[in-house]
Amino acid sequence: LVIFGDSLTDTGRLKERLKIFPLAPYWIGRFSNGPVWPEYLFMVTGLGVQNHAYGGASAADPEALPGENFYGRARHVGQFFVSGTIGLQISDYLERTLKDGKIERGDTTAFLIWAGANDYISKEPLRGTITTFLNSPEGEAGYKAVVERAVTQLGQHVRSLYAAGARRLVMMNLPDLGRTPIVLQNTTYVPEHLESNDTARRLELARRLSELTRYHNQRLATAVEKLRAELPGSEIILVDVYEYFERLYGIGGNPLLQPEDFGYDLAALAVTLSFEEQQLTLQRRCYDGSYDQGTPDPDIVCPNPDQALFWDSVHPTALTHCWNAYKVGNDLAEAGWIRPLPDQRTYRGWCQTIVKRVTLGSAEDTVSAP
């Protein structure tokens, strides 16, 4: 499995390049408090994994939005030079890793791309940009144009890999950005009809981010269908991360499965926003610090990091990464590409053992795959 992606997949490559962040209590350069999903997938399946992901990478090349100020443009350009794009990761792989830029075992190697979130959340710190971006989705500075550009580029990345010989390809959609702790942390977004009530502002931000996520996922699904028809001999899997995160939240899916069945204690970090007839329950982040803060202060880490859903404002915990690996692995197994994974109860016990060992300093020396 050859992977291209961003901080949701980065296994320490950005920190290896910068030698700076993320600092502890981030785990060995990961944007989480423990291993990230490709590492769990390797442990549970024995599948060979080659990971090219860099934290901060975007799906498309940075492009200034109309009306964006100098600070916003400089921020996007800076992020591009530090983290690059998925296209640069693929070009580097084709030029430096392969002989003559050709994939020799395209039928026994899968190529996975997971990106897009940075194309959108990079706008969040910028007050004017994020407001126009979300409030005017149809406008030239609105999110629909950015989604179209990101999804178009993701399709081009698949075509590049196919042209080099890849035949088994995996795309992943996005979890609901409107349910991440970034909604609780944000101070920059201003609704169209300004409310003095900050709760109403956050509810509107959550709604807009959820709309953006659904639009991205719909456009990506359409793009994947077109690619399947366009690329003869290809097998393309679309992993529905959005639906899977809904299950982890206890929304939809199997009504007999609740978050605690996955090992979560969501009540501990739950925050319910209520305004007039609107209500939404979100999860607070477990770690209240920043990438470059680095502190041994236990007070800024939640008391149950092994049972939390989100580590920081946008990144999942080690436990959530473990379940994301289970989702990806099961989709690969259903396609007949790898052997079946263990049943959910067995896998849960394995996940919890590893996560507790990493996050709580368990004394166990080894953890065998289930």
Residue ranges and their predicted role:
Residues L1-P370:
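Conserved active-site regions of diverse hydrolases
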